[in-house]
Amino acid sequence: MRSQLYTGLVLASALVVASPAAAFGQTRSFDVAAQSASTGIVAFARQAGIQIIAPEDATRGRRIVAIRGNLAITDGLRRIATASGLRLVSFDGRTAVLATGAVAASQVSQTDPATPVGVQPETQQASNELDEIVVTGTRARGQTVLTSSSAVTVATREDLDRKAPRSTAQALELIPGVFVEGSGGEVSNNFSVRGLAGGGQQFVQLQEDGLPVFYINALSDTILKQEVSIDRLEAVRSGSSGILTVNGAGATVNFITRKPDFDKSGGTFQLTTSSFGTARVDAFMTKPIAENTAISIGGFYRKDDGIRDPGYDANHGFIFRGAIAQRWTGGKLTLSAKVVDDSNIFYVGIPLTGVGDPKSIPGLSATHGLLQSRDFSLVRTRTSPTTGRSFQPIDLEDGVHTKAQSYGYDLTQDIGSDFNFFARGRYTNFGTDFNSIFSYDNSGLGLASDRLANNPTSAQTLARFVPQGANKLGLRYVDTGQVITGTAALNAINGNGLIAESVIGRNRASVKEFNSDTGITWQTPTNSLTLGGLFTRSSRYNDAIGTATFLTDVQDRARRVDVVALNAANNVVGSLTENGFLTYGTFGEGPSRAKFSSISAYATDQLTLWDKLRIDGGARFEHFVFNRLAGETINRAPIAGSGTYDANGNLLVDNDNIIANNYINNSFAGTYTAQRREFNKVAWTLGANYLITPRLAVYGRYATGFQAQEQNTPTNLRFAEGGVRYSSGFLQASVTGFYTKFLDYPQSRDITSTVGGVQITQQLTANSGIKVYGGEFDVTLRPTTWFRLQASGVIQDSSISIGELIARRNGVVVDLNTIDPALRATVQGFGGNRPERTPALNINVTPAIVLPNNLGEIYGSWKRIGKIYADVSNSLELPAYSVFSAGVLFRLDEAVSLSASVENIGNVIGLTEGNPRGGFVENTGQNTYFARPINGRNAVASVRFDF
């Protein structure tokens, strides 16, 4: 009967030849995925070279967390016991015994270091986040969150499943101190860290398996998606973040993928549906193909209508990845490849009403509506012949279409017992067509009747066509030709009477980039020293050829309208717009080509004293060279065939009586300006962690960092932080106070006006700084076996300081005194304001009822975002909001699990940004405005099969 009791576990490998005492402290390299306890214990035993004995019924229905990295065998056994809820009865250095239930201290081997003195067995039975081994932001082996001297967050696969992020950016909400504007859909979302102004993705470096997706973190989330091939997320804020990676001074977020398994075949197959028409399949499979060789493949395919449905497939495409790994004594090499062909809709700001209390406009839902529609999903816009074409096709149904391939390697090799050499690198070939619309200036949103009666351009249009008999203006729908005129009829359009200017465009970008990290670590029982180098070489192309401003009504799935001149019989005799297009070349046509390289040398060292004090420091020297050829533009160029022009380009005869197709604004001149930036800079950090007891630690850190800004001057940063961490089965808590100073952080806005028919763009750049004081917390409370409460967030106070002002007119530096004095005074008054789109409060609370026998959990989520300001002037306040969500994770057995989540149950209208193209001051005094709300109520459900 005893043989049956321990059936299936575990004579997985040869016995350790070394003495038991040596085995206790022996460090090995582990790569064990999160999985069922019955298979995971086998895999761990094989890699540790020991026996593990446990009753089969004790492991049934239990799971272990991922165990990866270099750590002592006893530390690995602790993690298995902690995560699975088992207890470690004994370990003599060769054989470990696991069982269920409580155990007296006298029953555990007196030589067993797996149970620290003073720690009761029951305190180890719950998964402990602070005991997670981290590899991001450190080179020390076996580094845990508890003993780290940086602000570290680890999110396991289960944490990601519980979060059920609708985008990669939403996964970052698991990190305290990071504010995510997840309202843009799957891609191109904005996020910021520790009080930095929102908008963009600066100062946060997204990594995949320890390497940057891109050196300049833009559109990384088009090829880094949430999928079952992702094993976990690790994040480091400030501190060592700017040492061990490039352009990540504020934070490094590392998504770590599942690796080939040398010990067993297995994988995951997952089917997903949603309330917005998702049909998705995810898969991952790994298989050993020889004793020391293993492969894995994975990826997903999906399509859906989008939470905001444009009337066509919003998201469609796939990612496919594969890897092959070879191991040998003391070393391993993994070769990987990934292919992306994916299209995504990009959600932009929509018209809303109610400043300070946002509400839907009649006909356009703030939670589920959008302007995109089939009416203008496939159009052609006019371009200058100097671009190589006269028309640019724009396909919104193709969306943000990304095609990319990446190829990587990851090599580790032990050299003797104390040294480890590592080399990892990745080449990425990336291309995207960013087909989308964008909100325009807030002044372009208003009543149709007001625009026709009071807009200066409208008056000019009517005067232009008086010789043709025009006596009034009206609107004409492009799709049907219906003409609407008269104040009453115009005010009745869609029940709101509004029309809006938007911009449509197709931004093309391509990137060919290689990133690598190579170094050597010298590890002793009390010290870990790493010397390494980072290298990047990148070639980029970008253009916005074909952008155009157009007019629509305001409704869900809007329709284009023309502004037309009418005669007494209501016949059209002329038009301001062409098929709804008001102007061409809105964002300029100039293409750009850039090449840059970055070479960094870094050193990090961690010294351990008295087994309690860890002192670490690091420095990185970077040599950066950036060269760009930026296409030059001219103010406007005549469109051939539209009319007769004089030698100066002035229109003499309009062939078709359409004003919009006479000229292209900001047209490509066919020439380029050379831009260059070269710098040598050093980032450094010093930190310490003191383990007061096995459960309680304090830490502190100071760091300097910098961020490359392409051809612009790099931004310098300063960080200081200190915190306390506590870890037990009842409570895991990490509380951090921080100070951040962003130096020479430029903020620029364009102000465009028309003088004498000539468009003039005035740009005012403030070389400002930002100071932030704040506190972060990450707490998990487990008062009983069936209840868990997690809370994380940040409370911060950030303010702007204004330095030198630089004025430009149409791109040329001019005397500051030539700029409107009122504008200058206003900008100088921004000092002391809060940075735009930066909340003072950002909190997430997640209570969960844990089902017995490891069946799963039922959880809720409350997110609170404090008020933010849409602009640097703090003139438009976007109010605070709370979002409630809920979900369930349920395991039918070890192989089959179900998950479902409902996001924004209350259908709350929460605004993440105003109108980023609205200038310094967005509040125009109107009650209607552009803003981007979070998505409304939606649900996602999956069934997962592990094998």
Which residue ranges define each predicted feature?
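Extracytoplasmic beta-strand/coil segments of soluble accessory domains associated
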Residues: 96-99, 136-144, 149-152, 169-211, ...
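Gram-negative outer-membrane beta-barrel transporters
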Residues: 110, 119, 124, 766-872, ...
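Structural signature of Gram-negative outer-membrane beta-barrels, strongest in the C-terminal barrel
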Residues: 511-513, 523-569, 590-742, 782, ...
